[in-house]
């Protein structure tokens, strides 16, 4: 009988399992698919720290500097992290908020700075900066491989004694006020600690112990376009003026996702994993407008994924409901870049009864009933799964 069961083998669940195993906690990971079999491999996988709250920026900075950059030494193997530099592009209407948020990020030691369009153009000659009034620049930002990151965490967790089983969890099991395990399609499994990290599929599991999660499944899309040989790379950008993010990818490709491509779903089971034609056309147009070298770039591939969206686009994290139950859900498209630090925090919370960062307790479920929703200076950035 394991001490802990983690439900969900995406990047967040994998990070939690890794950190529990590091602490010597006997851990079993369950997922109806294989590792990284849900939304994680469809992630945009940006690694950046530009957030409108200090807690999010701090978690992303720890993930970058203590995990993604030194991955080989800290975890082992490779996560595909590639440093490109990151820029957040703002129009005149967002300049005040941008100044506020960069100052907020700098206070938690994020290496970021405000940069004028002319200077940004010197850093990346491929950018057409029409409509950009000011930018934030993170020289250490970039992207990683979401599947390699997830599998890397799980591989090391297994070497440390954790186990993975491909099983669908159908409900949580309680006795009195305590969690006692999970029910699966193959029968019951016992554990005194259960962590639910199953993304948009978490709601029915929480409901089995009387918890109603305000999570809504949302379909979002990404497209890959082929870069010419004359453009070997470019900055990773979030373009709040045009409403997209873009980053380089391996084999001369560029990944793009759009702000206005959200599709709210009735459930997380019935959705098209292929991108819509209108989405691809709009993505191609916007990408070519901002990076003229990519105008008319050949479309290579595309995919869609599911976000577990909450009303304030912030997660539900920590102990909830019966004793021994922990949630790590509702990431709303921003889980990937913070997953390493979040796994460390939740493992600490489980072992010590409190997280390293007390402000993580604000990510509780009650905030949605109490009107304590968490918002930053401006709306969440363009999102992709995780």
Where do the protein language model's features map onto the residues?
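Central helical "cap/lid" subdomain
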Residues: 37, 187-234, 353
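Helical element adjacent to the flavin cofactor pocket in flavoenzyme catalytic cores
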Residues: 136-192
């Amino acid at each position: 009988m394991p001490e802990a069961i983690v439900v969900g083998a995406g990047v967040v669940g994998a990070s939690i399992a890794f950190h529990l195993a590091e602490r010597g906690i006997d851990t079993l990971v369950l997922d109806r698919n294989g590792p990284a079999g849900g939304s994680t491999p469809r992630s945009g996988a940006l690694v950046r720290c530009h957030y409108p709250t200090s807690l999010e920026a701090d978690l992303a900075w720890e993930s970058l500097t203590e995990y993604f950059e030194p991955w080989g030494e800290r975890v082992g193997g490779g996560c595909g992290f590639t440093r490109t530099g990151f820029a957040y592009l703002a129009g005149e209407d967002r300049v005040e908020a941008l100044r506020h948020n960069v100052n907020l990020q700098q206070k938690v030691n994020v290496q970021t700075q405000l940069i004028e369009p002319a200077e940004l153009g010197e850093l990346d000659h491929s950018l057409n900066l029409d409509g950009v009034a000011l930018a934030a620049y993170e020289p250490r930002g970039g992207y990683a491989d979401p599947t390699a990151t997830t599998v890397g965490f799980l591989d090391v967790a297994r070497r440390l004694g954790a186990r993975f089983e491909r099983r669908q969890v159908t409900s949580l099991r309680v006795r009195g006020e305590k969690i006692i395990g999970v029910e699966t399609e193959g029968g019951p499994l016992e554990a005194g600690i259960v962590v639910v990290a199953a993304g948009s599929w978490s709601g029915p599991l929480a409901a089995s112990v009387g918890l109603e999660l305000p999570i809504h499944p949302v379909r979002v899309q990404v497209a890959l376009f082929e870069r010419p040989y004359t453009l070997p790379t470019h900055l990773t950008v979030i373009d709040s003026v045009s409403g997209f993010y873009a980053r380089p990818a391996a084999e001369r490709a560029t990944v793009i996702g759009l702000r206005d491509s959200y599709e709210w779903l009735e459930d997380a089971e019935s959705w098209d994993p292929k991108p819509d034609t209108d989405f691809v056309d709009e993505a191609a147009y916007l990408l070519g407008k901002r990076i003229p070298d990519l105008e008319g770039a050949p479309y290579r591939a595309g995919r869609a994924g599911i976000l577990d969206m909450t009303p304030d686009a912030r997660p539900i994290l920590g102990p909830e409901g019966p004793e021994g139950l922990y949630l790590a859900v509702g990431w709303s498209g921003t889980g990937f870049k913070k997953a390493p630090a979040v796994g460390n925090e939740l493992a600490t919370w489980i072992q010590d009864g409190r997280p390293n960062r007390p402000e993580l307790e604000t990510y509780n479920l009650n905030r949605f009933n109490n009107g304590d929703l968490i918002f930053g200076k401006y709306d969440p950035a363009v999102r992709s799964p995780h």
